[in-house]
Regions:
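Anionic-ligand-binding alpha/beta catalytic cores of soluble enzymes and soluble regulatory domains
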Residues: 258
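Beta-rich carbohydrate-recognition and catalytic domains
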Residues: 1-146, 150-205, 210-251, 263-264, ...
Length: 274
């Protein structure tokens, strides 16, 4: 497929939602939520992951659909934000938010995590038997999204951070970054929240990475305004410091996630259509 020589990538006949960037061997894989807006006034319906690749963050090559959605009766009727992780030589996994408004608990639509696999970062297949839901004990069932999975080298296991809400945390300050752990990327256990500042409704699109001697936690909120925040700590155990200016860019650039080539780290986000 042809290249687009422009900084602000936009597919034909659709809109870009949250981005899920991944870097390997000179290429940035910019997975994104592909919103076709098939019904006037409706947003994020029949959303799937599509892919654009770039070597310089200027020229993008559109690669088409990466992960297909499920049927109307499946949890992944819509596919939302997640992350990509490599395991082994050519074994990749994408963990993503699955959402179907018709699947409800106590009258409310629930979110869950599903998983897809690939051997080339282009072609993906969802594991229909994998479905990970909130424990409904520490965390509410209704906000359980945006899984960010990474290898904790010190512990020798995998960690998953999620946009979640503490059970009984209140309507306006219950938002937290949930923590789950696994040794095999299949079986996961819920742990106490990774970060729970009691400041936001929810904390979307969490991500953590190390740069220099600091760890950075990135997340996005809409409590007071649409923006992406970051926190800093010397270890993953915290304490997480709040910088004086703790936001990325402006409200027009939302849900920022990053990818690094080992030397530089680039931020990817979506810009509002109006």
């Amino acid at each position: 497929m042809g290249q687009m020589d422009k900084l602000f990538f936009k597919p034909d006949h659709a809109w870009v939602g949250d981005l899920i960037p991944y870097y390997e061997n000179g290429t940035y894989y910019a997975y994104y939520l592909h919103d076709p807006r098939i019904t006037p006034g409706e947003f994020a319906e029949q959303t799937t992951w599509h892919l654009a690749t770039t070597e310089d963050c200027r020229k993008f090559r559109y690669q088409g659909e990466a992960i297909a959605r499920g049927g109307d009766d499946r949890p992944n009727k819509n596919i939302y934000t997640g992350s990509v992780i490599k395991k082994g030589e050519n074994e990749y996994y994408a963990f993503y938010t699955a959402y179907n408004a018709d699947i409800r608990i106590h009258g409310k639509s629930v979110q869950s995590v599903m998983r897809a696999s690939s051997q080339d970062l282009i072609h993906w297949e969802t594991d229909e038997d994998f479905l990970f839901v909130a424990d409904d004990c520490m965390y509410e069932s209704f906000d359980w999204r945006d899984p960010f999975v990474f290898k904790n080298e010190e512990e020798g296991n995998y960690w998953m951070l999620l946009a979640a809400r503490k059970k009984g945390g209140g309507a306006h300050r219950g938002g937290c970054t949930a923590l789950c752990k696994s040794r095999d990327l299949v079986n996961w256990t819920c742990e106490e929240p990774f970060y729970a500042p009691e400041m936001y409704v929810t904390m979307e699109c969490p991500e953590v990475f190390r740069m220099g001697s600091w760890w950075y936690l990135v997340f996005s909120t809409f409590s007071d305004r649409f923006t992406t925040h970051y926190r800093m700590a010397k270890t993953l155990d915290g304490p997480w410091e709040i910088p004086k200016d703790d936001v990325f860019d402006t409200r027009a650039d939302y849900a920022i996630k990053t990818a690094s080539d080992g030397q530089r780290r680039f931020a990817f986000g979506w810009i509002a259509s109006k």
